């Protein structure tokens, strides 16, 4: 694919107002792309104002209505686009359904939420297929980049892998374990990604998937996403959610956006790509943060919980020349953003 600025084409980004999608659109616009973003309500000026403030937005950004669960609703957005970045995913939020399950297995999925199986699985799988069906109708399409998650790789029973061998893109999380523990978020990522691979293989669509770990960094949307809220809580001394993390991979939000663009543009990119800067135990993270930000009430240690030890290999992504920001840069940028928005007092 031609990477010259003057020949950048049009691409579509689903779920445009989200944490990752906003950063992806920012980077795409800075790279010279014309971007069509899909949102549920293009008229919601408050929710979308941050997108229109991005450099190049007034000249090269278009926002259109689309809904994951509506067949054909992505047709208009995707038609004429050379590339599609499918980053939209079901919104995790408290459920009024008395049958909703509280996912307390956060050591596996990294998300603490109340949600029913239907609220997460159906939109994730059907939504992905709806987007891909629209891609199939587009003769201009070159490549689709799907945002998956390392929760589609690392949810494994402790005796199911060798902790001394880093997990790589050939690894898949256990569907059976997810169903047994009723952890729907990682299950949705597994099933949606597998459905995407099957559909694209059957229909001749060039697909690449990106699997980020726990994403940290400045938030462009006005409301903090769940991961940013978790980080804010930790920096204020609220440890309940992080107590469950155990061992977790971390990556800068800007790196995740840049990774998506790299695997879209790089002709030889193929298959899955784990996007992760570092993997740390809770106490390793606590020690680092306490030393770097001594004025914040971050706990010096977390409760020791028995968790499977694992590491992640990023050699495939690094072979394309990718370099990750450090854990220190992630938190420096995140904290600066939280201070600027008034969520934290200046350090």
Model-based region annotation:
Residues 22, 41-126, 138:
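NAD(P)H-binding glycine-rich loop region in Rossmannoid oxidoreductase-like domains
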Residues 2-4, 30, 327-347:
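Amphipathic terminal alpha-helices
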Residues 257-307, 311, 334-338, 342-347:
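Mid/C-terminal beta-alpha module of Rossmann-like enzyme folds, strongest
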Residues 108-111, 149-182, 201, 220-221, ...:
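Active-site "gating" loop of Rossmann-like NAD(P)-dependent oxidoreductase/epimerase domains
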């Amino acid at each position: 694919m031609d990477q010259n600025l003057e020949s950048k084409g049009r691409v579509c980004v689903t779920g445009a107002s989200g944490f990752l999608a906003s950063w992806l659109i920012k980077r795409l616009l800075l790279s010279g792309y014309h971007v069509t973003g899909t949102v549920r309500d293009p008229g919601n000026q408050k929710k979308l104002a941050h997108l229109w403030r991005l450099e190049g937005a007034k000249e090269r950004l278009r926002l259109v209505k689309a809904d994951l669960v509506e067949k054909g609703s992505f047709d208009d957005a995707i038609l004429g686009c050379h590339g599609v970045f499918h980053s939209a995913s079901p919104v995790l939020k408290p459920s009024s359904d008395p049958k909703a399950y509280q996912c307390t297995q956060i050591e596996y999925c990294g998300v603490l939420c109340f949600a029913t199986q239907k609220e997460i699985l159906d939109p994730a799988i059907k939504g992905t297929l709806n987007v891909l069906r629209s891609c199939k109708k587009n003769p201009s399409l070159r490549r689709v980049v799907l945002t998956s998650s390392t929760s589609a790789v690392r949810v494994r029973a402790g005796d199911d892998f060798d902790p001394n061998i880093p997990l790589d893109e050939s690894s898949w999380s256990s569907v059976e374990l997810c169903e047994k523990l009723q952890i729907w978020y990682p299950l949705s990522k597994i099933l949606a990604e597998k459905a995407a691979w099957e559909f694209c293989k059957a229909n001749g669509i060039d697909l690449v998937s990106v699997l980020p770990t726990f994403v940290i960094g400045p938030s462009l949307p006005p409301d903090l996403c769940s991961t940013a809220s978790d980080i804010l809580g930790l920096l204020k001394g609220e440890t309940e959610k992080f107590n469950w993390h155990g061992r977790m991979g971390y990556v800068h939000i800007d790196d995740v956006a840049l990774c998506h663009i790299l695997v879209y543009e790089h002709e030889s990119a193929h298959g899955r790509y784990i996007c992760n800067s570092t993997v740390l135990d809770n106490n390793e993270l606590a020690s680092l943060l306490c030393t770097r930000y001594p004025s914040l009430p971050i706990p010096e240690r977390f409760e020791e919980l028995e968790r499977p030890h694992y590491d992640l290999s990023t050699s495939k992504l690094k072979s394309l020349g990718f370099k990750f920001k450090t854990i220190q840069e992630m938190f420096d940028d995140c904290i600066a953003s939280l201070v600027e928005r008034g969520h934290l007092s200046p350090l």
